Amino acid sequence: MAHKLDGKQLAGEIEQRLSHEITLCLKKGVRPPGLAVIRVGDDPASQVYVSNKEKACRRAGIKSFGCHLDANSSFREIEEQIIKLNSNQEVDGILLQLPLPIGLDAGRLLKVIDPRKDADGLHTLNLGRLLKDEIGPRSCTPAGVMALLAANQIEIKGKNTVVIGRSILVGKPMALMLQAANATVTLVHSHTRDLIGFTKQAEILVVAAGKPQLIGLEHVKEKSVVVDVGIHRVFKDQNLGDAGGYKLCGDVRREEVDDFVSAITPVPGGVGPMTVAMLLVNTVNSWQQHCDLSLSLDDLLP
């Protein structure tokens, strides 16, 4: 059976370390770090994600600023809220929970966030810094993947690595981070011809396709490392539908590949907790810069 890349355990260890650093600073009279999460509308999945982030903030000792706006809020109303948070001296990180309701331009709103408070690493300036391998907030999911690989002592340098998916949230920044770690990276997507021809060569395969159980045994190389970024709520039994209940799954058919690959992330409990952990790391890193602190977080940053 493949080694489990346990993101839940590692995320817990990161939270404890952040909590320790924060507690030491609070004893010296420094204000706590603050993270503001803007949620627009009542998307059920977004509610769960925001709740998880708020709980993680409490565990780490980060002050959470919740901001819930109505689904029919205008671009200007959301923009004004971001501008207020930009000037709030108690807020070190700002996250705009995606997806937004139809009709709102997420890209334009992300540009309104102060790049120094960009907790999700999605501001154009910070994506440019990633491209140039300069210091700045990093996209949380790929940063979490890099931390998970490092913690499990998985060698990246020189490895044939394939990333499935080219989104600005995961695929593109993931490829850049792997390249910076000296992997040989191929980025594939929905228009790629002969997907299996690429994935079968991957010593490290990162799957961020957004399609439930897309990848199976026929796609993977023996003894490879598989990182499953996807998480989906699907019927336990397609024939029974709602009556049969639901289950969570990823983009990979794990039961098929578990005895064939060397390591794999579980779903849930793999990449998801690491995404939240890196959100906290970005926030605390911004906090130390705003408060002119010297924390030893370098090994947590990709």
Curated annotation (Swiss-Prot):
Pathway: One-carbon metabolism; tetrahydrofolate interconversion
UniProt-listed PROSITE patterns: THF_DHG_CYH_2 (PS00767)
GO cellular component annotations of the record: cytosol
Alphabetical UniProt keywords: Amino-acid biosynthesis, Histidine biosynthesis, Hydrolase, Methionine biosynthesis, Multifunctional enzyme, NADP, One-carbon metabolism, Oxidoreductase, Purine biosynthesis
Catalysed conversion reaction: (6R)-5,10-methylene-5,6,7,8-tetrahydrofolate + NADP(+) = (6R)-5,10-methenyltetrahydrofolate + NADPH; (6R)-5,10-methenyltetrahydrofolate + H2O = (6R)-10-formyltetrahydrofolate + H(+)
Transmembrane intervals: none
InterPro entries documented for this protein: Aminoacid_DH-like_N_sf, NAD(P)-bd_dom_sf, THF_DH/CycHdrlase, THF_DH/CycHdrlase_cat_dom, THF_DH/CycHdrlase_CS, THF_DH/CycHdrlase_NAD-bd_dom
Family (UniProt): Belongs to the tetrahydrofolate dehydrogenase/cyclohydrolase family.
UniProt function note: Catalyzes the oxidation of 5,10-methylenetetrahydrofolate to 5,10-methenyltetrahydrofolate and then the hydrolysis of 5,10-methenyltetrahydrofolate to 10-formyltetrahydrofolate.
Subunit annotation: Homodimer.
Protein name (record): Bifunctional protein FolD
Species assigned in the record: Prochlorococcus marinus (strain MIT 9211)
Gene for this chain: folD
